[in-house]
Amino acid sequence: MGFDFKLKISNASQLVVISKGKPFLIGKEMSNIEIIENGTMIIDENGIIFDIGTFKEMEEKYKDKSFEKVLDCTGKSVLPGFVDGHTHPVFSGDRVHEFAMKLAGATYLDVHKAGGGIQFTISHTKNSTEDELYQLLIPRLNRMLKNGTTLIEAKSGYGLETETEMKMLKVLDRASKQFQGVEIVSTYLGGHAIPKGMNASEATDDIINKQIPELKRLKDAGEISPANIDVFLEKGFFEYEDTKRILQAGKDIGLECNFHGDELSYMKSGELAGELGCRAISHLEKVSEDGMKAMAATPTFAVLLPTTAYILRLECPPARRMIELGVPVALGSDFNPNAHCLSMPFVMNLACVLMKMNMNESLVAATLNAAASINKSSTHGSLEVGKFADFVILSADKWEHIIYEMVDPPISHVFKKGNLVFSNNN
């Protein structure tokens, strides 16, 4: 006997919709999220949300329908799956040995000059095979999943030359096809640092004349599927004009611009984003008032990474001012060997404590707005009819426990496209 529907999530104390019909939220909208008390959600055979409403109205409306599975969520909260707007998950070799240096006061640039930092990771990643990198990636994705993350932006960037950069993008493409729990939107980051033996101009030429043409060839052949191009815009790395050239070359082959900016120095990132029509900028600790206004006008998403400010003891980006000016604010973990965080609940907590965002704003930034920052909010980031049924169930009657309980939130189940992909009973 066939069933009318795949799944019914029944009588959740709080069913956190986020927003109805908006691709992202800005300003005061971020504090006004949509919640259905005692809510029920109906999911079809394709893993799409078919209907959502109060328990009472859904029971009456679907009393004659059959369900393959009914999950009683009395006393529980249901939220959208979290979207991590900025990760570097493909790498070999940890950097635990650098943590003591940082605690003793070494800056990011000090570690870099001592032969650590990104160059350490690059050498290890270059020497790893595609299969070795894939085997390292999957446990990381599983740890993200158990923390409620169902969609990530994921970068290359630990090659700085054609072969390794393409190898990393192939690993991400393979995981995207074979790992069902966490969906991946990949980003090409050939301009993450200056390779040894080159200056910035030479590195820029290599990216534009060698790496991007090979990326286009592999993309056209279906071997990789990058959606974005990223550059580390920073003094001593890729500065304004080089960054602009690289981003434009990516735009010319259909990639969205989603770059690192204004982290350690003010580099006119917001202004550049306005000039090129960029989708998103990450970090922004040093962004200017004019830069924020340019981002609000475009609009360009601010993907804020409180883990980085926390671990490097940097000043935090001006999240409150961004929200006041109408910049769309998203969150990311910045998971990488320097900031080893796989938990969006912890990121949301840090956003509240360090960046003075309220809990509603943090949740919007880690769901709908993060999805929009990677052009996925038409299908992800909120619990709306027609979107994928990616959601997290909490063993708590108030959704705020996901932030309040910080590093060990009471996540009982995670669903991806209507399929159970994590249960704490397992």
Curated annotation (Swiss-Prot):
Gene label: amdhd1
The protein here is known as: Probable imidazolonepropionase
GO MF annotations for this entry? imidazolonepropionase activity; metal ion binding
- At the top level of its lineage, which domain of life is listed? Eukaryota
Family assignment?
Belongs to the metallo-dependent hydrolases superfamily. HutI family.
What EC number(s) has UniProt assigned to this enzyme? Answer: 3.5.2.7
Q: Which residues bind Zn(2+)?
A: 260, 334
Q: Where along the sequence do coiled-coil regions lie?
A: none
Which source organism does the UniProt entry give?
Answer: Dictyostelium discoideum
